[in-house]
Amino acid sequence: MESAKATHMTTVALVESNANPKGVQLVSTYQTNRMGDPSDLVELAQQVQKADDFIRANACNRLTVIAEQIRMLQEQARRVLEEAKRDADLHHAACNVVKKPGNIYYLYQRESGQRYFSILSPKDWGPSCPHEFLAAYKLQHDMSWTPYENIEKRDAEISIIDKLLNEQVALPSCHEPNFRGLTN
């Protein structure tokens, strides 16, 4: 019956003996060339095996972190592509006014299927709203669109970035992140 766990043989490399390297005796040949206790070799082999195991475990742990970062980056890339498609679709919606960054626009759909932007909200229309209201968006200065329900969060993010750019013109000389003043 074969063992389920494969036996791994560890090879221990010992220092080659040279009694007089370059003509100089550096160490006692008696101490370095004598046959020692066989348990010393076993202990050396165990130490090398333990080091191999730790190196493998550390490499696996680091690769696991990298794999998780790759998954996160793939998810971010997917979101970026979805947002870019949404933004492009919204920029192609019909609109009879010049859209200006910083303003909120309301997306409606006619019975014909045409989608269009208006500056009038459903509240402005009241009960006489002529078409189906789809969503509201804020046009950002980078020409991206922020859904109405995310405007506060996005504005807070932009505020923090503005604060960072305005208050920390030069990067601090320390090697640690400096978030002083950003959260107050």
Curated annotation (Swiss-Prot):
Pfam families: DUF2452
Coiled coil in keyword set: yes
Any coiled-coil regions, as ranges: 63-89
Keywords of this entry: Coiled coil
Matches recorded under InterPro entries: DUF2452 (IPR019534)
Domain of life: Eukaryota
Matches recorded under PANTHER family: SIMILAR TO CHROMOSOME 1 OPEN READING FRAME 50, UNCHARACTERIZED PROTEIN C1ORF50
Record protein name field: Uncharacterized protein C1orf50 homolog
